[in-house]
Amino acid sequence: MRVAVIGGGPSGSCAAEILAKAGIKTWLFERKLDNAKPCGGAIPLCMVEEFDLPESIIDRKVRHMRMISPSNREVDISLDRVYGKSDNEFIGMCRREVMDAFMRNRASDLGATLINGLVTSIDTCLLYTSPSPRDS
């Protein structure tokens, strides 16, 4: 089996890592390897553990934040209200280009081939190895 994973963000990199670890020939395509994606970069603690991310990529541990929408609606988030005062729970803030590169490199280290390029179309073919039940 051979698999092409299109997009080297967290989901694509994670998929490529799992496939490569299973011994499946994997290509991971990403159009911008140095992309500084304009997103908040907030990662809940459970996802830091789930993705097995090292603390070195976390720039800041946040317990309180205010999110402001483009229409200026504000939402305050406080982990103290949910978990009480504890340093064990936090939201990790990181730069996406750092996290994405870490995850892509980990997939590559496990055997995935990283390709810097834009995928605009995919040609596929059908291969029949046995007659279908309709042909009987």
Where are the regions that the model predicts?
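N-terminal Rossmann-like FAD-binding beta1-loop-alpha1 element of flavoenzymes
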Residues: 2-24
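Short, well-ordered alpha-helices that flank and scaffold nucleotide-derived cofactor binding pockets
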Residues: 17, 21, 49, 105, ...
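Glycine-rich FAD pyrophosphate-binding loop
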Residues: 20-38
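Conserved N-terminal glycine-rich FAD pyrophosphate-binding loop of Rossmann-like flavoproteins
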Residues: 32-52
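A conserved beta-strand/loop capping segment in the N-terminal third of enzymes
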Residues: 48-102
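A conserved short coil-to-beta-strand element within the FAD-binding core of flavoproteins
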Residues: 116-126
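Conserved small/polar residues in nucleotide/adenosyl-binding loops
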Residues: 128-135
